[in-house]
Amino acid sequence: MEQLLIIEDDIGLNQGLSKALKADDRQIISCQDLKAAKEQLLCGGVSLILLDINLPDGSGLDLLREIKENTPGIPVILLTANDTDLDIVDGLERGADDYITKPFSLSVLRARVNTQL
């Protein structure tokens, strides 16, 4: 079973993403901060991560670095309002597998998630 980890501090968006990406063969785990995300990653089994950059307890880019150092096989899609070319290039150069700016289309998000899985 695929396991998606959503790390997004906006509760409404987090819940909406969870609902939109849920499938029979997919488990959704959601966190709203880095601390909870790190605890969840220690449990293992994550197939893909949707990661916001601006979180209440730090930068998602710092967590991205840790993920790519410790579990490089897990695809990470950055999901953020930071939408300048410089932000996008920075996120991809730091190891993100994809970069989606808010606001976004759910159909595009689903397609990008499915491509990474």
Regions found by a protein language model. Give the residues of each.
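The feature encodes the CheY-like receiver
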Residues: 56, 84
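Acidic catalytic/metal-coordinating carboxylates
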Residues: 33, 59-62
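Conserved acidic carboxylate
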Residues: 8, 55
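Two-component/phosphorelay signaling modules centered on CheY-like receiver
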Residues: 10-29
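Active-site residues of response regulator receiver
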Residues: 52, 80
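Acidic, metal-coordinating helix/loop segments flanking the phosphotransfer/catalytic sites
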Residues: 30-48
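Short amphipathic alpha-helix used as the core "switch/output" element in two-component signaling
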Residues: 61-72
